[in-house]
């Protein structure tokens, strides 16, 4: 959709032998779906030429033509995200939803009205598989929902060995394990930011799906450090995480900076290595790292850098940062970042696309932007997730949270989950800590 302030608009689209014009008397251009798909097919590995003309009074104004590059590599067919008001501590209706990438159809994965309007958060998928996922239910009817095909479990992850229930997840590629951080989180109004979210304690553990047990080592669960945001490498042999020296909170929030570290993991024995490597030193670089995510081919890591802390969505200086894991060199992908917040991000299953959260439109609401990533790590210009109506986002009073690509449609299992929540969850236990 193209919008031009209610004026009459004419748009000419060209690619190879395909050429057509779309007229819009009200200024809202709606391109027919079949014609659009034919145009993209013709323009693969090439570009679409777009010429826009607008009628003002008796005159026509014609803009310079622009070219839209069209990649050969497909994007995954579905995008999953949470929709939530960008408030402080209260909520009413929230849910996890999915959107078809070849249409404007949005359907429900789970809405909190099924469980007395509790908090629903932290959805995660194993290898972009729509049939292997998890998310948390908080407050009333609490637990962690674990889905594996037709099998659904609810886990009670509060134990006497941990400081809280399981929090930020990341699946091992085998599906046998899930890394979680365990966070004691606080939210407060802040003198310089709209709000500030921080941890007063946090650890990292790895959960064994088959045994309902979890394990950790002192380096990942210590009172001397805050450890969070774990993620596995694509081969499953390394665990990345963010860590900072423990300090008095909130007094030291402005000085709290997280480094990016890595420890080896043996999936056969379920054990960790003894050596910890630092990939990004917060003290040396003057930045704090969040959300480390490795591309499916293992070549690049995308993360978020901000001035301090561990909740960058409220920090306008938060930017995406790309590390070449082969050379160890990192840089800011300029095409992705803006003058406002860039935060959570995830890769497509083929590693050629990223989707990320940004507040660049109005500084208030988080919207999903999508960008192409070449095999050399170079990024294309991001575009906002398209909607059927040009003014859709202007009227949407909710933020997009945790956008994740998946390779198919997620089955709605809401009633089954509700029954499990009423029955209570399976207790998990500690095997090594």
Say what each PLM segment does.
Residues 2-433:
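Sequence signature of WD/YWTD-type beta-propeller architectures
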